[in-house]
Swiss-Prot record:
Annotated disease: Nephronophthisis 3: An autosomal recessive disorder resulting in end-stage renal disease. It is characterized by polyuria, polydipsia, anemia. Onset of terminal renal failure occurr significantly later (median age, 19 years) than in juvenile nephronophthisis. Renal pathology is characterized by alterations of tubular basement membranes, tubular atrophy and dilation, sclerosing tubulointerstitial nephropathy, and renal cyst development predominantly at the corticomedullary junction. Renal-hepatic-pancreatic dysplasia 1: A disease characterized by cystic malformations of the kidneys, liver, and pancreas. The pathological findings consist of multicystic dysplastic kidneys, dilated and dysgenetic bile ducts, a dysplastic pancreas with dilated ducts, cysts, fibrosis and inflammatory infiltrates.
Protein localization: Cell projection, Cilium
Spans annotated as Disordered: 1296-1330
Species lineage: Eukaryota, Metazoa, Chordata, Craniata, Vertebrata
Organism whose genome encodes this protein: Homo sapiens
Keywords: Cell projection, Ciliopathy, Cilium, Coiled coil, Disease variant, Lipoprotein, Meckel syndrome, Myristate, Nephronophthisis, Repeat, TPR repeat, Wnt signaling pathway
Keyword Heme applies: no
Keyword Cytoplasm: no
Name of this chain's protein: Nephrocystin-3
Length: 1330
């Protein structure tokens, strides 16, 4: 084991000698061997290795030969004691470390074991929870499926219930209306029997008197509102009518005070006053005869005539002033055309020139010294043959030392002599031509504004439509947004539809339509069906004219749908227009939603509301309703039962009629008979002096035998084609070609080829094609001025000649100043002939897009660009360009302000934006626009844009977002204008309306009061704008159930409406009516005829409604003088004029004159009319009121007694009207302190009221109150108290029945208010019966 000297055992002991030599004989201790510790051995190894390394390469460690490991690990026996101690200490240290290590590891193992056990427990718990969650999930999933199943079943049950509910609702409505109709029939029969009994009694025949029986046949609990009566209140006798019952539903009595309007008594304008403006406007628009196209067109056509001498003046006018006039008319929504022809040496354009003169609004003649004979005929046509009295102007350039020719002087003399009856002005000018042309421009501008457009002020060019000085038209009647262009389009369409040179045998159809109107309700709509071009529009328009003539009390609402996808076929615009028509006939105009869905809900309600109040029938006529997109969805109200007095007539093509409608009663238009077809064609030929040969007539008879060749439009077109060929001299050829055409489309193609071949060159042919294509691809048509700008090389001569040819051949027509196709077949023919393929159509649309885009870039945003450009982008599928166009704030503003809300929404939906995105886009665009705004005008325009955005968002239902732009508009107006400016009041009103809709009534009340204060300061306390704020406050308080405050403000509003000068109607038509008045005025300047006298009377009524009393007085006097000359001084029509003049004098407080006129009218009517005639009763009534007003009570007594007699003869002794007359007479006696005479009259009236109206009727209460006052003044205080107590009980009962909203009546204070008769009772104008 090596050569170590000794190993010492720790236990001590034995000495072992070394027997192997080297040291010899040296004793040592032999240690006891133990197993070395691993750590010790490792340390020993390290030390051994370190020692060997330290010895160097040339030496070996000691004992290496005997084994390196042991020699390196153990010291020799000769080691020192400190080393041993060190090893022992090291050993001890290692042992302790080991023990510590062992213990720590054991603890770690125990900890890990515990942690493992804990994790196992947690794992088991989580596994259990997971299994529980999986079970819960499965359970919830099953519950969800069962809930969905239950939901679907509930939805099915709800749909079934809704269907059953609607079915029951319709059945109940049918039942109710049937019973109402039966009640009406019974009441009508009762009245007829009463009148028969009275006639028999008058003849001396003894009959049974129902008044003597104990039955209650003459009593009913149902009555109408608005019964007029005079009452005596607290010592001061009132003479105003009472409100009557506002809680009754059905009318059962007839009498002057039971009429809902004065029109019900004596026809249109029989007894109209200024507060009946809405009804007056509607009636005048409806019953006045139709006039020429130029009156209603929104195009100002200026026809220029010039000579070689005045060519410089005309060129200067066209260059410098025609664009200004065009811009002025464009700003007001009108077109301006300055049409002129070159000097026509060969007279080849004579027919076209005459046509242009006939269409023109204004003719200007530039003349110097001579007048060529070629122009003489045009001048005579324009200036001397001017039956409609259109404005005319002559610019006569004078020159020193030179005398005009005889022809010039003769023309000027003739025009000067006619100047009293024609609107011809002559400008004589010498000097600078430019100065003379400027004078002409000033005169033309004035003529356009005053005479043609009917505006009163002459400075409209200084006012922008968005300026702060011009309140937008829609604000004149609240929030209703009316598009005058849509209304003009309908008027012109109706005119064109009713124009027919030949009768088509419609009499049998007229009778069927009349039977529908007279048929008992309920009745579904009548379907007028027929093939394309069968004459449906002509039939309906002719029948409407007959109804207006024969039944003036019938309210007719009509709408003529144009081609598909045009504005007239927009369902929301149709419903909105018809709703506004219904609102026009209501007593007040409330806010109208523009949301299409809500419009569909509100229209039937307005229809039912008006039908309950209107005395006559209401007829709704919609032509070509099948052209409306998704017509069944948007016209759902047609399938519901209609009110009793409402009838609906719709026309459809046979092929496109919705299947569900085929079950309705149908009037089918058959093709013309061969005989009628032949007669129409021959008559068309005779109109141009062309006669067909016998052989040609036989061929014609053989040709017109099929349904397509006997179609009304085909026959008309055939006749026009032959007449045109006869004038051109190629009759045989064209007749042969016409025989080859077996339907309308092929015949239209022949017409196109014929007109195209008549063009002079290929350039003209191409222009014709392009014009027709542009009209075809446009939204609503193209104007002539737009065509002239699109094709600058084109002359007016070519354009007017082409349009004349296309118009005569039933291809094109005018509508709202635009060229459009007369018939759908013409539109279809052009599409098939010239627009094959989408690429061609797209190219023409792009041409229009470029034109209108250029307009926008020039800041020319007109109603035309707003109508066409977005629609064209939509048709092209250009979403980004449409998006950019909609963000042009003025385009969107134009669409919204004209009520095209649904159209605007459809564009945004096409772009892919929802409501919130729309709002954000507009806000961002407005903010960007605001950064560039400078100056007061721009800030005012910005405020208008913010206001429009607010109103738009309100209509979208985004009320919280609508507040922000309206508040911003208010801030801008307060800063840019003045805090007390009227436009600030407008902003406050709009902001308040949002808060009302948002149910934040406190905010709304504060804003309305601020607007009221500003309006009162700006306009005065009696202005309609002030009344609007009062009405808004009344509505607000009513929503909060504050009925007393609501009644207070509503009374103030109605009083203002009574006194206000109503220069405009509630909805539309003032400018049109003014132009019509001017036209009527000119038409009455001819011979003395009864019709002209009636027209003068109408004009007097119209000017009276406009508060132009002096002008009204002139026309009424002229009417009276003409009637006295034509009819004689004792004719009833003269009494009508006298009555109207008396009412006018009464209005002017000229009571003496009014008394004389009333007395003359009464004398005539007493001799000419029956004792119970309504006209006699009205004259008696108003003369009696006048006597009372003048204090001539003695004269009034016999008239009031006569009124009692008349009503007894008319309605029987127990009719409420008789009681009203008795009360009026009793009031008069009370004023004269003849209480003894008054008492029995009151008691008799009370008995009639109780028997006929019931003991708790308000009339009974008012009569009791009058009796109480009479007893009080007679000293019978106990009886007075008893009567007054009973009167108060009746009033309290009515108040509780109305939910606290008792109508205002006469009280002891003498305060009077009546909703139905809120008008001054002494102001009535009459008009001739129709």
């Amino acid at each position: 084991m090596g050569t170590a000297s000794s190993l010492v055992s720790p236990a001590g002991g034995e000495v072992i000698e070394d027997t192997y030599g080297a040291g010899g004989g040296e004793a040592c201790e032999i240690p006891v061997e133990v197993k070395p510790k691993a750590r010790l051995l490792r340390n020993s190894f390290r030390r051994g290795a370190g020692a060997a390394a330290g010895a160097g390469p040339g030496s070996l460690p000691r004992g290496v030969g005997a084994g390196g490991l042991l020699g390196a690990s153990f010291k020799s026996t000769g080691s020192s004691v400190p080393e041993l101690e060190y090893a022992a200490a090291e050993y001890e240290r290692l042992r302790k470390e080991y023990e510590i290590f062992r213990v720590s590891k054991n603890q770690e193992l125990l900890s890990m074991g515990r942690r493992e056990a804990k994790l196992d427990t947690e794992n088991k718990r989580l596994r259990a929870e997971l299994q529980a969650l999986q079970k819960t999930y499965q359970k919830i999933l099953r519950e969800k499926e069962s809930a969905l199943e239950a939901k679907y079943q509930a939805m099915e049950r709800a749909a079934t219930f809704e269907h059953d509910r609607d079915k029951v609702k319709r059945q109940f409505k049918i039942f109710r209306e049937t019973k109402e109709n039966e009640i009406q029939d019974l009441l009508r029969a009762k009245r007829e029997l009463e009148s028969k009994l009275q006639r028999l009694q008058a003849q001396g025949i003894q009959v049974f008197d129902p008044g003597e029986s104990d039955s209650d046949d003459n009593c009913t609990d149902v009555t109408a509102a608005g019964t007029q009566c005079e009452y005596w209140t607290g010592g001061a006798l009132g003479s105003e009518p009472s409100i009557g019952s506002m809680i009754q539903l059905q009318q059962s009595f007839r009498g002057p005070e039971f009429a809902h309007s004065s029109i019900d008594v004596e026809g249109p304008f029989a007894n109209v006053n200024r507060d009946d403006w809405d009804i007056a406007v509607a009636s005048l628009l409806q019953v006045t005869p139709l006039f020429s196209h130029s009156l209603w067109s929104n195009t100002v056509r200026c026809y220029l005539i010039y000579t070689d001498e005045t060519q410089p003046e005309m060129d200067l006018f066209l260059k410098d002033y025609s664009p200004k006039l065009k811009r002025m008319c464009e700003t007001m929504g009108y077109f301006f055309h300055a049409v002129y022809f070159p000097i026509d040496v060969e007279n080849q354009y004579l027919t076209v020139r005459k046509w242009e003169i006939e269409k023109s609004s204004l003719v200007i003649l530039f003349i110097h010294l001579t007048l060529p004979s070629l122009l003489l005929e045009d001048c005579e046509e324009a200036f001397l043959k001017n039956p409609e009295g259109k404005p005319r102007l002559i610019f006569h350039r004078l020159e020193d030392g030179k005398v005009s020719s005889d022809s010039v002087q003769q023309l000027i003399d003739q025009v000067s002599n006619l100047n009293k009856t024609s609107k011809a002005k002559i400008i004589d000018h010498s000097g600078d031509p430019a100065e003379g042309v400027y004078k002409t421009y000033i005169c033309v501008e004035k003529i356009i504004k005053q005479d043609i457009l009917g505006f009163e002020n002459t400075d409209l060019e200084t006012k922008d439509l968005g300026s702060e000085d011009s309140i937008p038209e829609e604000d004149d009647f609240g929030d209703v947004l009316w598009d005058i262009h849509d209304e003009q389009e309908q008027m012109e369409t109706f005119q064109q539809a009713s124009n027919s040179a030949h009768e088509l045998g419609f009499e049998k159809y007229y009778q069927r339509l009349n039977d529908l109107v007279a048929a008992p309700a309920p009745i579904p709509p009548l379907l007028v069906s027929g093939g394309p071009g069968s004459g449906k529009s002509l039939l309906l328009s002719k029948w409407i004219q007959l109804q207006q003539k024969n039944s003036p009390n019938t309210l007719i609402l009509s709408h003529f749908v144009g081609r598909p996808m045009s504005t007239s076929s927009e369902s929301s615009l149709i419903i909105k227009r018809l709703t506004l028509k219904l609102m026009q006939h209501s007593w007040s105009v409330s806010a109208l939603t523009l949301d299409p869905a809500k419009l569909l809900e509100e229209f039937p309600r307005w229809l039912e509301k008006l039908s309950a109040r209107h005395q006559g029938s209401i007829i709704i006529v919609i032509d070509s309703i099948d052209q409306v997109q998704q017509v069944e969805k948007h016209m759902k109200w047609l399938i519901d039962p209609l009110p009793v007095n409402v009838r609906v007539i719709v026309s459809v093509n046979v092929e496109t009629c919705p299947p569900a409608w085929r079950l309705w009663p149908t009037l089918h238009l058959d093709p013309l008979s061969p005989k009628d077809a032949k007669s129409i064609i021959i008559a068309e030929c005779h109109s141009v002096d062309i006669k067909l040969s016998k052989e040609q007539e036989k061929k014609l008879e053989r040709h017109c035998r099929s349904a397509t060749t006997c179609n009304a439009l085909y026959v008309t077109l055939f006749g026009k084609m032959i007449a045109r060929a006869g004038r051109a001299g190629n009759l045989d050829k064209i007749l042969h070609q016409c025989f080859q055409c077996q339907d309308t489309l092929s015949l239209y193609r022949l017409v196109l080829h014929s007109i195209r071949e008549s063009m002079a060159n290929d350039v003209d042919k191409e222009l014709m094609k392009q014009i027709l294509c542009l009209v075809n691809v446009s939204h609503n048509g193209v104007s002539e001025s737009e065509l002239m700008e699109l094709y600058p090389e084109m002359s007016w001569t070519f354009l007017t000649s082409l349009i004349h040819s296309l118009y005569k051949m039933c291809l094109l027509t005018y509508g709202c100043g635009l060229l459009r196709f007369q018939h759908l077949q013409a539109w279809e023919t052009v599409r098939l002939e010239y627009l094959e393929g989408p690429t061609v159509t797209s190219s023409y649309r792009q041409k229009l897009i470029n034109y209108f885009t250029l307009q926008l870039s020039q800041d020319r945003v007109t109603w035309r660009s707003a109508d066409e450009l977005p629609w064209l982008f939509q048709q092209q599928g250009s979403k980004q360009k449409l998006h950019d166009c909609l963000l042009n704030l003025f385009v969107s503003q134009n669409l919204y302000k004209r009520g095209h809300f649904a159209e605007l929404l459809s564009y945004w939906q096409f772009v892919g934006k929802d409501k919130s995105a729309m709002a954000t886009e507009y806000f961002d665009s407005l903010k960007q626009y605001e950064k560039n705004c400078e100056g007061e005008d721009n800030m005012s325009c910005l405020a208008d844009l913010y206001e429009t955005l607010g109103r738009f968002l309100k209509d979208l239902g985004l009320l919280s977002q609508a507040i922000v732009p309206l508040q911003r508009s208010l801030e801008i107006r307060e800063t840019a204008l003045d805090p007390d400016h009227p436009r600030v009041a407008q902003s406050l009103h709009q902001l308040a309306s949002v808060y009302v809709q948002w149910k934040k009534f406190g905010n709304a009340e504060q804003l309305y009061k601020q607007a009221l204060e500003i309006s009162e300061n700006a306009y005065g306390a009696d202005h309609p704008y002030t009344a609007r704020e009062l009405e808004a406050l009344a509505t607000l308080y009513q929503k909060q159930n504050k009925y007393e405050q609501a009644e207070h403000f509503r009374k103030k509003s109605f009083k203002i409406h009574q006194k206000a000068i109503k220069k405009k109607g509630n909805l539309y038509g003032f400018a049109l009516l003014r132009r019509r008045a001017l036209q009527l005025e000119e038409l009455t300047l001819g011979k003395d005829t009864p019709d002209n006298a009636r027209t003068l009377n109408e004009l007097g009524v119209l000017y009276y409604l406009q508060n132009n009393l002096e002008t009204a007085d002139q026309f009424l006097k002229r009417s009276l003088e003409m009637r006295e000359r034509v009819l004689g001084p004792d004719h009833p029509d003269c009494a009508q004029s006298l009555n109207n003049l008396a009412a006018l004098c009464n209005e002017k407080k000229q009571y003496d004159k009014a008394e004389e006129l009333y007395e003359r009218a009464l004398d005539i009517r007493r001799r000419a009319l029956a004792p119970d005639h309504p006209s006699l009763a009205y004259t008696v009534k108003h003369l009696a009121i006048l006597y009372k007003k003048m204090g001539k009570l003695d004269k009034a007594v016999p008239l009031y007694e006569l009124a009692v007699e008349i009503r007894q003869k008319s309605f029987g002794p127990k009719h409420p009207s008789v009681a009203t007359a008795l009360v009026n007479l009793a009031v008069l006696y009370s004023q004269m302190k003849k209480h003894v005479e008054a008492l029995p009259l009151y008691e008799r009236a009370l008995k009639i009221y109780e028997d006929s109206l019931g003991r708790m009727h308000p009339r009974v209460g008012e009569t009791l109150k009058n009796l109480a006052v009479l007893s009080y003044e007679g000293g019978d205080f106990e009886k007075a108290a008893e009567l007054y107590k009973r009167a108060m009980e009746i009033k309290e009962a009515e108040t509780s029945l109305l939910g606290g909203k008792a109508p205002s009546r006469h009280s002891s204070s003498g305060d009077t208010f009546s909703l139905k008769t809120a008008h001054s009772p002494n102001v009535f104008l009459q008009q001739g019966q129709r």
